[in-house]
Curated annotation (Swiss-Prot):
UniProt name for this protein: Na(+)-translocating NADH-quinone reductase subunit B
Name of encoding gene: nqrB
UniProt xrefs under NCBIfam families: nqrB (TIGR01937), PRK05349.1 (NF003756)
FMN phosphoryl threonine PTM positions: T232
Domain of life, per lineage: Bacteria
GO molecular function, a single term: FMN binding
Subunit structure: Composed of six subunits; NqrA, NqrB, NqrC, NqrD, NqrE and NqrF.
């Protein structure tokens, strides 16, 4: 018996009147992973496309894999570089991640190979991702079952994005709390997928940032070594300018290429601009992400950073950060490529996408430079722009209406 025949055989049990009808959302989610839905339109308008929403979300999910794999490697690389023999023994005794890595025989030294660093990073990342996926998936299934809706695959993207934009040291219960806020409050309360006006992953991270700032900011959360502190590149620049960009372990200067590749501490998936550009190029080529939004973000960021460079400041080193450094530090790249381009919370109109993207770029630099307490600005910039996306679309639509009326009256 083939899989398709088996699914067709059990489908009546999940339809209205069947003994398992309340679990239809789960059946539909599993069945459409392997086969497209048999539903067809019965009246206009008919839209034909080779890519349905499920496949589109899975492609975005896969596009994040380069950043995910490099992020896991970097977690190990940063930790092993910071470890001393005393810190290693202390962490093995007090941290289950280290105890598990030690039981697996992982070489936790500065001489460790790529596989050891990758496996160590996976011990930190995978529990966070699994927690986010299970807890967020529970809320998705619950709301889909109550509303008798299908389970939307957008959660594949939300879950991995959330796991990639948090520090590797985030407690699992906070990961569960953050994704719960993002899914329930930022999405399901407004009607579910397609009706949320904010990016759920960013909303969840913002909730954690303001509720538990000690676990998402400061110098002690970015390197997975208890008892070690190491500032991010943004924090170093804000404190000491370009000359302050130093590797906390070796004392060597962090170059632009180091930052571009991702040889620095930070949230798991945001560190490597190179890996993010690989995935971003794929979703732009597949016409999933809007190139207009990405271009708008870059234009806004370059314009605002150039303005601050021109103004200058003797007391604020962030005024001197050039645009090409803004691009490779913090969460700018992952925000621009994978969050600003969220088709639900972004502007719909082509002109609106330019303004929406430009606002994100401007606000990101403005927050980074002017707010001394918060050197990272991409998260708040995107959430702020999400609120303005419908306004941009409204004015674009009104301008088109006025233009058509003027033509018809002329």
């Amino acid at each position: 018996m083939g899989l398709k025949h088996f699914l067709e055989k059990i489908e009546p049990h999940f339809l209205p009147g069947g003994k398992h009808e309340k679990w239809y959302a789960l059946y539909e989610a599993a069945a459409t992973i392997f086969y497209t839905s048999g539903a067809v339109t019965r009246k206009a308008a008919h839209v034909r496309d080779a890519l349905d929403s499920k496949r589109m979300m899975i492609l975005v999910w896969l596009a994040l894999f380069p950043a995910m794999f490099y992020g896991m490697y970097n977690v190990g690389a940063q930790a092993f570089g910071a470890l001393t023999p005393d810190l290693l023994q202390q962490n093995i005794a007090n941290d289950w991640h280290y105890a598990f890595a030690n039981a697996l025989g992982i070489n936790m030294s500065s001489e460790a190979g790529v596989s050891d660093k990758m496996l160590f990073g996976a011990i930190y990342f995978l529990p966070i991702y699994a927690t986010v996926f299970v807890v967020g998936g529970f809320w998705e299934v619950l709301f889909a079952t109550v509303r008798k809706h299908e389970i939307n695959e957008g959660f594949f993207v939300t879950s991995i994005l959330f796991a990639l934009i948090v520090p590797p040291t985030l407690p699992l219960w906070q990961a569960a709390l953050g994704i719960s806020f993002g899914v329930v409050v930022a999405k399901e309360v407004f009607g579910g997928t397609g009706k949320n006006f904010m990016n759920p992953a960013l909303a969840g991270r913002a909730f954690l940032f303001f509720a538990y700032p000690a676990n998402l900011s400061g110098d002690a959360v970015w390197t997975a070594v208890d008892g070690y502190s190491g500032a991010t590149a943004l924090a170093q620049w804000a404190a000491h300018g370009a000359d302050g960009l130093k590797n906390a372990v070796t004392g060597q200067t962090i170059t632009w290429m180091d930052a571009f590749i991702g040889k620095l501490p930070g949230s798991i998936g945001e560190v490597s601009t190179l890996a993010l550009l690989i995935g971003g190029a794929f979703i732009v080529f597949a016409r999933i992400a809007s190139w207009r939004i990405i271009a708008g973000v870059m234009i806004g960021m370059i314009a605002m950073s150039s303005l601050f460079n021109f103004i200058g400041s003797d007391t604020n080193a962030m005024f001197a950060m050039p645009w090409y450094w803004h691009l490779v530090v913090g969460g700018f790249a992952i925000g621009m490529l994978f969050m600003a381009t969220d088709p639900v919370s972004a502007s719909f109109t082509n002109v609106g996408k330019w303004w929406y993207g430009a606002l994100i770029g401007v606000m990101c630099v403005l927050i980074r430079v002017v707010n001394p307490a918060y050197p990272e600005g991409m998260m708040l910039a995107i959430l702020f722009a999400n609120l303005f996306a419908p306004i941009f679309d409204y004015f674009v639509a009104q301008a088109n209406i006025k233009r058509r009326k003027a033509r018809s009256n002329g």
